Amino acid sequence: GHVDAYGMNPASYITELHCDFFIVGGEFSKEEDINIDFVDIHFSHVEKWFKPPYDLVINRDSSEHLMCFQPDEAQANITWKEKQCKLNVFCSRTVPLGVGDRETKFNYAYRFHLSSKEKYHFSWFLEVASVLRECFMYLIGTGIYTLEIKMAENFNEESDSESHSEPKQYMIYFGVDVPSYIRTDSSLYCTRYDKLKDLFSGFIERWFENRSKLDVVVSSYKEILLNDGTYEDSLFLRIVQTLEHFHGIVFDKANKYCSKTEWKAFVDWFQKNT
């Protein structure tokens, strides 16, 4: 990147930094030196995909009540480009110091932890985070945005304690395009964790296994969900192209195409009902 500094008064110069990303917390002579073994990711929308972690138990015979913290938990093993890491779903929380006049909030956030036994270049972890984000776009059925990424090296708890170095944590910031419209209504989510918890680990693993085969479909699907200001006809055309490509992958050559009679009947039906 580069730096622009300008202004009439030297005491109040305006400085603009131009780069692909910022990494705060470390000193690196070159990008190739940034090797890590842990990433903490916070995505939008996922809080409502998992269950609320707090349960309030009200004692009718007393003024005392019980607040229980029981979040969803999940794990999966990920293999990406012949390297491996482990995914853990972690729910962070804050406890209020006192009771407010009108309400007391118990804030929480579901986060995704990626950890590996070996150190890998941070770009590999960012690729895994990107594929994981696409996976949750598919599960939830709306655009998902990365809210925060933290990285660390020497984090692996399975390392030998005698040779284990002090963990170092870094924050990474990317340029973000904020869309004009974001759908947040959780009632429109395609799936929920409580319906998929027995299949979650296997689903994540298979998603990464088949990601390269579905590259065009997944990229197009993500583009549809993240569109901002696209005309309706252009969006519909993109959906048709995506379904057509996906159809070509799933079905064999014998069943890939329908007859002209079936196609004409479908077009007639579509024109009458749209």
Residue ranges and their predicted role:
Residues 9, 30, 42, 59, ...:
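Serine/threonine-rich low-complexity intrinsically disordered regions
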Residues 37-54, 145-169, 263-270:
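Short, charged N-terminal helix-start/capping segments
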Residues 103-198:
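Internal metal/ion-chelating core segments
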Residues 30, 48-51, 81-86, 105, ...:
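Context-gated lysine
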Residues 1-143:
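Long, contiguous, compositionally biased segments that the model treats as domain-scale units
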Residues 161-163, 170, 175-274:
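Amphipathic, oligomerization/interface secondary-structure segments
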